Amino acid sequence: MPEPMVATKQMIEQIFDGAATSYDRTGPSIFTQFGTRLVEQMPLTPGARVLDIGTGTGAVLLPVARRVGSEGHVTGIDLSGAILQEAERAVRAEGLTNVELRKMDAEHLEFPDQTFDVVICAFGLFLFPDMEAALREMNRVSKPGGYTGVSIFGKTPPPFNPGWPILFQQIAAYQVGVRMPQPIAYAPEEVEALLSQFGFRSIETRSEMNDIIYASAEDWWAFQLTLGTRATILRMNEETRARFKDEYLAKLRPMFRQDGLHLSVAVVYAMAQR
């Protein structure tokens, strides 16, 4: 069986450009939930300068901007110009004036050394072809004693269990897979080891289990078109895609409860200092 194609930066940009208007707006808006949870754990103070890497539509950016106040400043960066436009709309809707949005590669941050009090990257590490470069850059732009926070899917159980394991089995059978540049799930000790390797200290990790409910099969399928899985789905021609979807959702329907499809999602949160 052929190996799945590995997503390039250009592909990742195209994925999120295409998904921008529906990103985190299908089903329960999990990235807003998880972004808020990450921000709650960060030692943010009024007046802080913060960098949000892979800002998306603002799941972390918006609560951070509220926390640091008008004297603080938040810079959100992303590879996707279209998704930054959605973030800009959200910023304007809240009337926030302490936010800057920039199209930028996390592996080549365009900031001087020791610029930020806090650096945050929510669900972004697995999107970086050169994760080591991104982590080095995160450390470089942090002030001495500054804080870095990351979140990523946990390994146990597999993310979105049982929805994703069944999906990935079917993708393998169809031989159309596009995988992200890095593994998408990590154990807490693996996240700690990564941060330690690139100069971070005083590392704290915690894993939290979440029961995520999608009210309908169509909501869950629509969610797949807002993630890296979008690239795999769109590689199929229209006829194959329709057959794939029907087969996949047929496998899931017996698992639905009265209120929808329950999926287990472990999230690893980590905080460290430079």
Regions found by a protein language model. Give the residues of each.
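Conserved Class I S-adenosyl-L-methionine
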Residues: 3-12, 30, 57-59, 182-274
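A short acidic, Gly/Pro-enriched loop at the edge of an enzyme's catalytic core
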Residues: 107-118
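Short glycine-dipeptide loop
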Residues: 47, 70-71, 142-147
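Conserved hydrophobic residues forming the short capping helix/wall of the S-adenosyl-L-methionine
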Residues: 68, 90-91, 171, 195, ...
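Class I SAM-dependent methyltransferase SAM/SAH-binding core
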Residues: 49-109, 133
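A short SAM/SAH-binding and catalytic strip from SAM-dependent methyltransferases
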Residues: 117-131, 154
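Conserved class I S-adenosyl-L-methionine
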Residues: 2-48, 59-63, 83-86, 93-94, ...
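Conserved catalytic/acceptor-binding region of the Class I
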Residues: 132-133, 139, 143, 147-215, ...
